[in-house]
Amino acid sequence: MNKLFTFIMLWMMSCLPTLAQAPMDGGVWKDNTGKHINAHGGNIFNYKGTYYWYGESRSQDGKPYSSLGVSCFTSKDLKKWTNHGLVLPVSNEPGSDIEGGCIIERPKVLYNQ
């Protein structure tokens, strides 16, 4: 009986990878404009059937650590992403916590009623 139970459990666990579906099979993830998704250190969460991806938007001018701010992308299926631009751009105000040239590490978004 114990051997049968072990066999059934192992067989069931071997079926799990076939049930899981990857949102994408690799390659470059692009948004609705055809550009590479620029959301470094971000997180994805689901709210009312829409996935939201917030992350640091980094400069594309050859300066790998120059932050532009926090960008937002949305998707219904984790495959097709819509770019909503910068939702929190860096500030031109000297001394600001998000002053131009800063690095924004792992931005988070909290729901506020």
PLM regions and their residue ranges:
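Positively charged n-region of N-terminal signal peptides that target proteins for export
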Residues: 1-4
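Bacterial N-terminal signal peptides
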Residues: 6-15
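Carbohydrate-active catalytic/glycan-binding domains of CAZyme proteins
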Residues: 19-113
